[in-house]
Curated annotation (Swiss-Prot):
Organism: Pseudomonas aeruginosa (strain ATCC 15692 / DSM 22644 / CIP 104116 / JCM 14847 / LMG 12228 / 1C / PRS 101 / PAO1)
Alphabetized NCBIfam families for the sequence: PRK05205.1-1
Entry keywords, A to Z: Glycosyltransferase, Transcription, Transcription regulation, Transferase
Family note: Belongs to the purine/pyrimidine phosphoribosyltransferase family. PyrR subfamily.
Enzyme Commission number(s) of this protein: 2.4.2.9
Residue stretches spanning the membrane: none
Reaction equations catalysed: UMP + diphosphate = 5-phospho-alpha-D-ribose 1-diphosphate + uracil
Enzyme type, top EC level: transferase
InterPro entries: PRibTrfase_dom, PRTase-like, PyrR, PyrR_bifunctional
Name used for this protein in its record: Bifunctional protein PyrR
Record GO terms (molecular function): uracil phosphoribosyltransferase activity
Positions bound to substrate: 36-37, 77, 94-102, 151
Classification via HAMAP family: PyrR (MF_01219)
Gene Ontology biological process terms in this record: regulation of DNA-templated transcription
Length: 170
C-alpha cells in the first residue's frame, strides 16, 4: 500500500474543517499545532483556509505519560500560545494519530493554560491503533499498518510521508 500525498489531502481537510466549524457556529477558531508535524499541517491548513490568525504551538514532551520510560526528546521546545485559551474555540492539529497519547498530553497542557470553549481535533492520518478514546473530528486519511510499521511526516516543504519498519529484537 502506498502512502498518500499530504498536498492532495489538505484541500479536502480544509473543506471538511470549514463545514465542521460552520455546523457548530464557530467563526474565528484559534489554531494550535503539536510539534513538529502538527505545526506543519496547521500552517498548511491555515494557508488553505486563507486564515491569517497567529498559530499556537505545543511541545507536549513534559506532558506525555511515557517520558519516564522513553526519556525526553532531545529537542524539547517551548510551547507558544500567542492568544488567550479561556473561552476560545481551538483547532488542535497533529500529523499522525496512533495511540491517542500525544493528543491526551496536548489537551492536558492546553487546560493548564485555560479552559477553551471547545477543541476540534484535526489529524492528517489516523492509524486506527488507539489506546485511548480519542477520535479526530477531521482526518485526511485513515490507514491500517502492521504492528511493526510506523508513519512519519517529513517537511516542512514539501510535506511527505515516510513508512518505517521497526526492527525486532531477537
Amino acid at each position: 500500500m502506498s502512502l498518500p500525498n499530504p498536498a492532495e489531502l489538505l484541500p479536502r481537510m480544509a473543506s471538511d474543517l470549514r463545514a465542521h466549524l460552520a455546523e457548530r457556529g464557530i467563526e474565528r477558531p484559534r489554531f494550535v499545532g503539536i510539534h513538529t508535524g502538527g505545526i506543519w499541517v496547521a500552517e498548511a491548513l491555515l494557508r488553505e483556509l486563507g486564515n491569517q490568525e497567529p498559530l499556537g504551538t505545543l511541545d507536549v514532551s513534559f506532558y506525555r505519560d511515557d517520558f519516564t520510560q522513553n526519556g525526553l526528546h532531545p529537542q524539547v521546545r517551548p510551547s507558544a500560545l500567542p492568544f488567550e485559551i479561556d473561552g476560545q474555540h481551538l483547532v488542535l492539529v497533529d500529523d499522525v494519530l496512533m495511540s491517542g497519547r500525544t493528543i491526551r498530553a496536548a489537551l492536558n497542557e492546553l487546560f493548564d493554560y485555560g479552559r477553551p470553549a471547545s477543541v476540534t481535533l484535526v489529524c492528517l492520518l489516523d492509524l486506527n491503533a488507539r489506546e485511548l478514546p480519542i477520535r479526530p473530528d477531521v482526518v485526511g486519511q485513515t490507514l491500517s499498518l502492521g504492528r511493526d510499521e510506523r508513519v512519519k511526516l517529513v517537511g516542512p516543504a514539501p510535506l511527505a510521508l515516510e513508512r518505517k519498519v521497526l526492527s525486532s529484537a531477537s
